[in-house]
Amino acid sequence: YQVGVVGATGMVGQRFVSLLAQHPWFHLAVVAASPRSAGKTYEEAVGSRWAMPDPMPEQVKNMVVLDASHVEEVASKVDFVFCAVDMKKEEIRALEESYAKAECPVVSNNSAHRSTPDVPMIIPEINADHVAVIEAQRKRLGTKRGFIAVKCNCSLQSYVPAIHPLLDLGVTKVLACTYQAISGAGKTFATWPEMVDNCIPYIGGEEEKSEKEPLKIWGHIENGAIVSAEQPTISAQCIRVPVSDGHLATVAVKFANKPAREDILKAWASFGGEPQKLALPHAPERFI
């Protein structure tokens, strides 16, 4: 598959570029970004801002950056795009829908469409079946092939998978406290020196996302939309900490009836999903 990264010069875009460099299924054919980067080689556009631990892949250095707003041009060169633009939410929604309407599927790292009822928010091991809602989304957008799918808030990925296998044991409440690295804000210590030896006890919007997004992931499709689950009740507190990469979560879970320790361990050990069944390239053999 020929793929593109829209928003390729930012920190998340760089991560996509790094992950795609040696991917066995996907060939990085297009890097796109803002007009100020367009026309430059990727190496020129990113320069000293390359923030990944591995060197910039050789095959991308001399690729010419396209203008992300030139949707038809980008879409004509790829089978689908990964989107990691840094823009206002309204602008992101419009841009992603433009790509979808150009019959170019969009896999988005952004939060702009996470609350859109017919846009699936996927953790593949948990709710791969939610891709069925794409049929309704295509009807709304008037597309045959184009669609938008999104990933959830990055901090949720650390603990929602651990809670999911326990839902059948009667989880009623979740109390989560996340300690989130500065990479989640698209920053490094070089670009955010104020975070050295510092903590920010509140991250605007993160608590709301952390309380709502898991319920959409655990929801079901009804009348062409994803209806969020009503349980469990989730309360979250999100703190920015002086760590470069990697989020930490401390989570307390309440059950209707306390399960045995052995039942919890068994649920974790036996849980897997479609990525494990299909042996996908980046899927861990054991999910938890």
Located regions from the model:
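N-terminal Rossmann-like NAD(P) cofactor-binding subdomain of oxidoreductases
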Residues: 1-202, 231-233, 262, 266, ...
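C-terminal substrate-binding/catalytic lobe of Rossmann-fold NAD(P)-dependent dehydrogenases
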Residues: 202-288
